[in-house]
Amino acid sequence: MKNAILRLAVAGLLFAALLPAQEVTAGIYGVVQDSTSAVVPNAAIKLRNVATGRTHQTATDESGNYSLVFLPIGTYEVSAEAQGFKKLVLSDVTLRVNDNRRILITLEVGQLAEQVTVEGSAVTVNTASGTTSQLLDGRDMIKLPSRGRNVLPFALLMPGVVSDTPYDRRNNRAMVNGIRPTHNAWLLDGGYNIDTGGNWGTPLSPNIETVAEFRAIRGNYSAEFGIGGGSQFNVITKGGTNGLHGSLYWFHRNDKLNARNFFSPRREPFKGNDFGFSVGGPVYIPKVYDGRNKTFFFVLLGWIKERREQNFLQIVPTAAYKTGNFSGLGRPLFDPDNGMPFAGNVIPAARIDRNALGYAKMYPDPNFLDAAGRNWTTLAGRVDDTNEKNFRIDHNFSDKHRVMWRYTPEFRLNDFATSSGFSFLRQNNQTPARNMTANYNLNYARKSLRRRLFVGAA
C-alpha cells in the first residue's frame, strides 16, 4: 500500500507538465478610492483566511487597481490601509471555487490608527464573468435528502440537466442543455476524474463527507475548461483548518419502508449501511512541530455495505418438458429426420441426447405463474461493498508558496447472480480506483503580473 502511494506521488510530480488542470481556487480584484472617487495608489491590501489564518498581500498600482488570484476557497477578512486614511476592514468575504470577485474599496480620510469595520459580505454577485453555474456547499449537501448519499446526482439541481440514471453513484449520465453525457468533464480538485474508456462517468465518486463545494458550470466557461462541450462538474474536497474538526457518521437503509415494485410479486429485501469518520485540523506534534497557520491535514475512512436480494422472473421448462414430453405445448413437434410430427408430441427417450438431459436437469422446477407465462421466481443474494479513503495535506511555505496533495483510493466488491435458474453462475467483481491531485502554487508580483504553477493531477 505504501509503495502504491509513493509510486502515484512520484508519477504525479514527474508528469506534471503533461497533465492539464482546471482552476480550483478563487480571486478578487478591484479599485481603492477615496470618498471623492479619486484612486489611492500604493494602498496595502491584505486578506486573512479566517479558518487557517493564512494571509495574502498585495498593493494597488498607480491607477488604484489591485488583484489577488489563486486564493483557496473559504471565508476571508479583507483589509486596506494607506497613509492619511483610516484602515478599512471587510469581514465575512466568502470566496467560492472559480469565483473572481470585484470589490470596490472606499477609504475615509483620517488617522491610520483609526479603523472602519464593515460587517457582512462585501460582494454577492460575480460581475467579472458571464459563466452560468450552480454552486452547492458541502454542508448543505449533507443536510439535503439524497438516495445513497451520492455526490454526482446533485448535478440534477442545476437548470437544464436531466439524466436517465439519476441515482447512479458514478455513471450519472447527466445531459446538460441537450448535450450528450459523454461531453461532460468531471473534476476532483481540478484534476480529471473521468472514465477514459468511454467518458460515461467517473472511476470513483467522492464521499459526501469530504466535499467542501460542488460547482456545476453549464455555459460560458473560460478556456481552462476545454475537454468537453457539455458541463464542467468541479468537486472540491475539504482541507484542515486551525481548529480540530471531524465527523462520525452512520446511515442505515432497509426495505421496511420501501414500496413493492409494481411488476414484482414481492418486496425485494435490502439493507444498506454507510458509516465511517473524518478528522481534520493542523499538524501538531507537542514540543516537535506546531503546524497552526501553516500545515493542515484531512483524513476520511468510510465503508458502504449493502445487502440485497435480486428478484428473478423467468420461464423454465416443466418437469414433463425435461423428459421430452411436450403434450401440453399446444402445437406439434416435428421429427427432423422425416418431417413427421412426434406421436403424442412426445420425443422418444432414445432420441434425446444424454448431454441435453443432463443440461435440462440443471433447471429448477416451476414455482410460480403469472399472466405473462413466467413460471419461476427466486431471490438471489447480492453483495455491494465499497471501502473509501481520503488523505489530504496542505502546507503554506510562505504567503507566496503553498502546496496541496490529496490521495483518494477506493475499492469496490460486487458479488451477484448472473443468470436465472442457475444459482451456481455468479459474478465477482473487485474494482480498485484511485485519484490523486497535487498542486504547487507560486504567486509573485512584478508589474502586477501573477503566475501559478500546477504540479500535477492524476
State each model region's role.
Residues P181, V211, K238-G240, G272, ...:
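Outer-membrane beta-barrel channels and translocator barrels
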Residues F85-G239, H245, H252-S264, N273-Y284, ...:
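Periplasmic N-terminal accessory/gating domains of Gram-negative outer-membrane beta-barrel systems
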Residues Y66, A174, S231, F277, ...:
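Membrane-embedded beta-strands of outer-membrane beta-barrel proteins
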Residues G120, L248-N254, V299-W303, W405-P409, ...:
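Transmembrane beta-barrel strands of outer-membrane/channel proteins
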